[in-house]
Design a protein with these regions (language model features):
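Sec-dependent signal peptide recognition
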Residues: 5-12
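C-terminal motif of bacterial Sec signal peptides marking the signal peptidase cleavage site
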Residues: 18-21
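N-terminal active-site segment of His-dependent metallophosphoesterases
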Residues: 23-118
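Extended active-site neighborhood of metal-dependent phosphoesterases/phosphodiesterases
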Residues: 35-53, 57, 115-209, 231, ...
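Residue-level marker for buried hydrophobic side chains located in beta-strands
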Residues: 65-67, 106, 141, 212, ...
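Active-site glycine-centered loops adjacent to acidic/histidine catalytic or metal-binding residues
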Residues: 70, 108-109, 144-145, 215, ...
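Active-site-proximal segments of metal-dependent phosphoesterases and phosphodiesterases across multiple
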Residues: 80, 207-255, 280
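Short, solvent-exposed aromatic-acidic interface loops
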Residues: 299-305
Length: 305
């Protein structure tokens, strides 16, 4: 293939990415991405080995979790951290003032451009504010594709440390629930992470309920009418992943990425796409999951103050 033909293909690909992705993108920063899934997962697992993984003790037998995604902080957005225009802050505040909520999830895409600023804003938005928040409940995060573009994975690591980990919940009634968080920032979970995931799910019988959280939505949608980098997992990986979810009796897989609400039932597993908190949408919303004898969920529109 000659140089001009290669250049033509690259330009077409870049145009497709720009047209189908989120707005305000630096296309070069998306295409030239030096962060590798396998290397990141090795870093995440090393961090876990040194620091342990979260365990929530003495939780009620029935509780709620909140899940959002795609807040896409940008220096150019009209955001005042922990202020009137900060949707992520309002989301976290709502969760921390809900007496039945246990923790929050952010399913990836915290930023929308290069640089550290968006990660700083995210960290500030989820920081406990005793003046407006009743309790200091945690927010667990995973990395999204925008969080690895522009070589931003280093900033995610500095601020949030890991994106491949588990959170175990132990209730007062003797139940245990498992939450597994994954890195799909490059449009794949990678070999090592999938092996690790299968190992975690090999103990599924110990748990009442099991949830898996990752950024990239698995299915085609009306929005996702073309293939873009990190749009969906490779097809063979998608099939293997969904087979593992079904064989392991996973209750729910929570994902984001496409800025819309969508639900699919496949192989006995409920797949749910959270809506988004992006400043560009008029009606941002998030997911509330009720966990007890059964698992139910509903979307809630964000009530801005």
């Amino acid at each position: 293939m000659n140089i001009m033909k290669k250049l033509h293909i690259i330009l077409i690909a870049a145009a497709v990415i720009f047209a189908t992705g989120c707005n305000r993108l630096d296309v070069a920063g998306m295409v030239i991405n030096r962060s590798d899934t396998e290397e990141r997962v090795a870093d995440w697992l090393d961090y876990n080995a040194q620091n342990g993984e979260p365990v929530i003790e003495n939780a009620p037998d029935e509780y709620r979790i909140y899940s959002c995604s795609d807040s896409h902080y940008s220096e150019r957005d009209s955001i005042v951290t922990q202020g009137a225009n900060d949707r992520l802050y309002h989301y976290i505040t709502t969760m921390r003032n809900d007496s039945e909520a246990l923790f929050a999830i952010h399913a990836g895409d915290m930023v929308n451009e290069s640089g550290e600023k968006g990660f700083v804003m995210t960290e500030e938005a989820i920081r406990y504010n005793p003046e407006t928040q009743a309790t200091d409940k945690p927010c667990f995060l995973v990395i999204g594709n925008h969080d690895v573009y522009f070589d931003c994975a280093t900033f995610f690591k500095q601020h949030f440390h890991t994106s491949t980990y588990t959170v175990a919940v132990k209730t007062v009634g003797g139940h245990q629930d498992l939450y597994v968080f994954l890195d799909s920032g490059n449009g794949t979970h990678g070999t090592r992470q999938l092996d690790w995931l299968e190992e975690q799910l090999s103990n599924r019988d110990k748990y009442r309920h099991c949830f898996v959280i990752s950024h990239n939505w698995l299915f085609r949608t009306s929005y996702n009418y073309t293939t873009t980098p990190a749009a969906n997992l490779p097809q063979d990986e998608q099939y293997a992943f969904m087979d593992l979810m079904s064989r392991s009796n996973v209750n729910m897989v929570i994902m984001g990425h496409f800025h819309m609400r969508e639900q699919r039932q496949f192989g006995g597993v409920q797949y749910v796409m959270t809506d988004n908190l992006n400043e560009d949408v008029e009606t941002p919303s998030y997911l509330v999951v009720n966990v007890g004898a059964k698992v139910t969920y509903e979307y809630q529109e964000l009530a801005e103050e």
